[in-house]
Amino acid sequence: MYRTYRKMKKVFFLFILILLGHLSAGPEETVKEFFQDFINEDILAINKNSDSPFIYIMGKNAVLEEKYSDAINFNGLKRDGWSYSKINTSKVLYDDDDTSMVQVNFSRLDKDNEIILTGDVTYLLVNKDGNWKLKGGFSPNLTTLGND
């Protein structure tokens, strides 16, 4: 009886591991996690949740960097008054097993919770080994990543 119990316990444990592997964040949740990492200025998490190279197209300007963290300058954003960002709306535009596009309307706010910028960005995500990663961002009206 004890042997049967141990076998059942192992099977249950394997089932849980497999289930957890399939419960990774979807594209929209990945973008929300990315925004939280951005607010926390967590460079390691930002790079973990984005793919390399990363491209950002803002109007007619294109930024191609090895890592997303190479494209962003938090000190520059803070000089412009940025304290944090928030997602106003998000919507999955396209989704298959390998790629996804998520449209986001967001605001940047200052320390007094005043909006200093509202923008739209569409993120391209790729599925790498079961994990969604940001590959690129496309924005008609995002003016700066803090590098001006």
What does each model-identified segment do?
Residues 22-25:
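Sec/Tat signal peptide C-region and signal peptidase I cleavage site
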Residues 42-57:
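Short, well-ordered alpha-helical segments enriched in acidic and aromatic residues
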Residues 50, 60-61, 104-108, 121-123, ...:
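A mature extracytoplasmic/lumenal domain signature
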Residues 71-115:
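Surface-exposed, charged secondary-structure patches
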Residues 116-148:
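Short beta-strand edge/turn micro-motifs at domain boundaries
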